[in-house]
Amino acid sequence: QGGRNAGSDAEHAAADYLVGVMKDIGLADVEKQAAQCDRWQFNSASLTIDGKDYNVYTYATASTPAEGLTAEVVYVNKGTRQDYEDLDVTGKIVLLDIDQRNDWWITYPMLEAMHQGAVGVLAANVGGFAQIADDALNSQDICGPVGIPTLSIGVADSKEIQKLKAGSVSATMKVDNEVEIDAGTTYNITGVLKGKSSDHQILVGGHYDVHFQGFQDDNCAVGLVLAMANAMVKSGYQPENDIVFCLHGAEEWGSSYTQYDWTVGAWEMINHVHPEWVGKTLAFINFELPA
């Protein structure tokens, strides 16, 4: 299912690959620049009901025990406080509908479920994101604590599980998520097209961490940035000022227990790794969702 999250093995492997590509292009001063982040290593997730495996994907939330957790599934509509009236979900897995564009982020129903005593969350994106098909899954930054295991499930599968609710439905959820606080390193990859002067610079960039396969967000941007760099080098063009091609890590997510958990790689770059870029940088041409 992909996933190249902040500080993960996959993100580090991609960083090494991008360093090689920038060197092959012929950029100068190619560097893999370390920045601090929380680490999210997603290894696996599964959901099984009556011997049937359902396709699921995780958020940057807690793991289950290695053997998984088995509990009754309770449908709670949108998972608001009012939706729990007359329900006891203590020790149970809640199934809920969510529209993260028009209502609220996954953080809120996850925290409410935890407050109500639930041990896990299954969230079906009925609006907003993941609308390309009724089996589409979603992942977002969590903007809060790791909480309890929280999985995205397709709308069609959610409806199927709800139909099973004529009787008690028991599910086994397994989530292997390593979310480690202050224990991660992300890398920002830079290469320079030298200008006539290095007193100032222009940044051209995007981010290379992704949810799933990341075609649109943001692998297309990575390809665009590298293609621009390659074309400029091959043309023999020399700009007036340095052009720094910068590919950031830890953009989608990079920190727990905060609502400011995204763009961590870029924030670390300008605040801690290269604070001297403030005042030196004329422009940052950032590519996001360019497809």
Where are each of the predicted segments found?
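Soluble metallo-hydrolase cores and metallopeptidase-like ectodomains found primarily
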Residues: 52-86, 139-216, 227-240
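Sec/Tat-exported extracytoplasmic proteins
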Residues: 1-6, 18, 23-29, 98, ...
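Structural recognition of the beta-strand scaffold that forms the well-ordered cores
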Residues: 31-32, 75, 93-97, 120-124, ...
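Acidic/histidine-rich catalytic neighborhood of metal-dependent amide-processing enzymes
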Residues: 101-102, 106-108, 112, 188, ...
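Loop/turn elements at helix/coil->beta-strand transitions in domains of secreted/extracellular proteins
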Residues: 25-29, 89-94, 116-121, 168-170, ...
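Solvent-exposed loop/turn segments at secondary-structure junctions
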Residues: 4-6, 36-39, 80-81, 99-103, ...
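A conserved hydrophobic secondary-structure block that centers on an alpha-helix together
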Residues: 81-133
